[in-house]
């Protein structure tokens, strides 16, 4: 597998790549991953990997071949291009030393990872199967990144290069299909492989976790967990916090916009920005909140579906989604029955939804309870990995070793 993001990264694509590779290893396969240096979501290389050019390590039975790359602390089109370029160049200059594989899978993004995987598969003459987690061409156009128009054109060409060379293409949501087809991919080659909930169920009493976090028993707490990037449009939460000092808003995580958000919220005492929770405490923190928020800019339609949603649903708390009604994120919230939708970039509407849930505890609990039911029925780890297995088996023509 080629995946720039991999363990110990705990957010975004990394956990999915890790669980797939570890699943392969646990079932007796010799699993190798060409990965970057751990840097997400902080967009800062973790201390133990700083200054490391290349490293090969064994993690849970998986051989991980790491290659250094640039890590832009602030996202612009040029810096993103340098990031992708460094991944591509280092991957080409120092491909993993390993036996010929049966198949090459890529997690996309990164774009460079997809291109590298396509080239490795061609060199080894084995099937190539990319799994599209985000559409970077659409992301550049829709996220508001500086220089986005030129970046969108470049990213679209790189995506098309990789995807048109695939044996099969996995997409995590049906809203991606039309764009993938527009890149020249045969619709008959596209398979739906939704992500799954990769976190455990909460285990601690909510009151205990709230006390530990300093959240008062009667206070309404709205929590956003995950990446603080451009496409999230987290300014809407800062705006909502300004409107009602009695409601506590918590942004938990890291990302390229963290410093800007901290500056924007410097005079908002009821908004806290806290570091990511440890993996073993993460589910309990989500469950301790009254409302879980997912936000996106209004322009974000078909470029991504936040991986945080699967974790939110597992936590058993109601979701307020400030997203475009016609996008994939809204579809998933509707499908789950575990939340409510409000217009994107509208602090007043978001706050009104939060107040409505706070004023109807039974209704809020009913919405929240729908989340774990949806996970059990559709988003379990076992079901997700079975879909990946089926994708691999089909690409190998039923001749999986």
Regions found by a protein language model. Name each.
Residues 1-52, 56-57, 239-242, 400-401:
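N-terminal subdomain of nucleotide-sugar transferases
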Residues 216-232, 238-242, 250:
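Conserved donor-binding/catalytic core segment of Leloir-type glycosyltransferases
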Residues 247-250, 259-283:
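Nucleotide-activated donor-binding/catalytic signature segment of Leloir-type glycosyltransferases, i.e.
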Residues 115, 119-123, 149-169:
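Membrane-proximal helix-turn-helix segments that form the acceptor-binding/catalytic region
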Residues 37, 175, 196:
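Carbohydrate-associated surface elements
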Residues 349, 356, 363-378:
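A short, well-ordered alpha-helix in the C-terminal region of glycosyltransferases
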Residues 232, 276-287, 292-313, 319-331:
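Nucleotide-sugar-dependent
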Residues 49-54, 202-215:
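A short helix/loop element that forms part of the nucleotide-sugar donor recognition site in Leloir-type
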